[in-house]
């Protein structure tokens, strides 16, 4: 090992800590105010603006990293739901509830402009919904009248619609969440089991 190796490791650890602090500060500030600037984020992270730009060359790059971090956290929470056990429809609703809680906890997610990477970020969530819906169709809990891809797209669109309704104060978050659950249930249930 060279004499410089411990110094390099220390610098890397410092850089990792700075990046983590910047992301945490950005998430907190952007949840409060979507137009929070890089200077304010640097202050909250207790780093210089130059350090922020060293990690994230633009505000768009920082926003993308924030969304990536929140997506990672969400996927960890989704995987903890143990989607392979229990009634499929119940698990779909649990997944919707978890996603809704993420939107409530991080309002910035509802305020960000649509990005080119959004479909890519939705990919893991889409895959979980697809597995659940296929399982539910096999067991007869979920309608077979509509294709899996259509049902997943409809669920995601409903989630975005509910989020937008809450974000623009057309509905309270509680009513939007209830409407989302009711609509999702009606969409997915076999016709014979609908109320």
Listing of model-derived features with the role each one plays in the protein:
Residues 56, 61-70:
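Alpha-helical DNA-contacting segments of helix-turn-helix folds
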Residues 35, 142-143, 171:
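Conserved hydrophobic residue
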Residues 1-6, 94, 127-139, 164-195:
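C-terminal peripheral helix-coil segments that are non-catalytic and often amphipathic
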Residues 65, 76-104, 116-118, 122, ...:
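Hydrophobic alpha-helical connector segments
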Residues 46-56:
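Short hydrophobic/aromatic patch on the recognition helix
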Residues 21, 40, 61, 90-98, ...:
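Amphipathic alpha-helical interaction segments
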Residues 94, 114-141, 146-157, 164:
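Amphipathic alpha-helical packing segments from all-alpha helical-bundle domains
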Residues 1-32, 38-44, 61:
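Basic, helix-initiating cap at the start of DNA-binding domains
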């Amino acid at each position: 090992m060279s004499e410089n190796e411990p110094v390099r490791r220390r610098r890397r650890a410092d850089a990792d800590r700075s990046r983590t602090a910047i992301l945490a500060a950005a998430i907190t500030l952007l949840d409060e105010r979507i137009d929070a600037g890089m200077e304010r984020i640097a202050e909250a992270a207790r780093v210089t603006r130059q350090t922020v730009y060293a990690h994230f060359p633009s505000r768009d790059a920082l926003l993308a990293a924030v969304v990536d971090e929140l997506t990672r956290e969400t996927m960890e929470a989704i995987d903890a739901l143990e989607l392979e056990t229990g009634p499929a429809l119940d698990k779909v609703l649990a997944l919707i509830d978890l996603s809704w809680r993420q939107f409530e906890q991080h309002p910035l997610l509802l305020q960000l402009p649509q990005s080119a990477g959004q479909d890519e970020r939705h990919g893991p969530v889409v895959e979980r919904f697809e597995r659940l819906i296929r399982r539910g169709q096999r067991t007869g809990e979920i309608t077979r009248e509509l294709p899996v891809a259509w049902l997943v797209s409809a669920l995601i669109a409903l989630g975005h619609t509910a989020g937008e309704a809450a974000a623009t104060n057309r509905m309270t978050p509680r009513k939007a969440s209830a409407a989302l659950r009711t609509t999702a249930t009606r969409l997915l249930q076999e016709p014979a089991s609908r109320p």
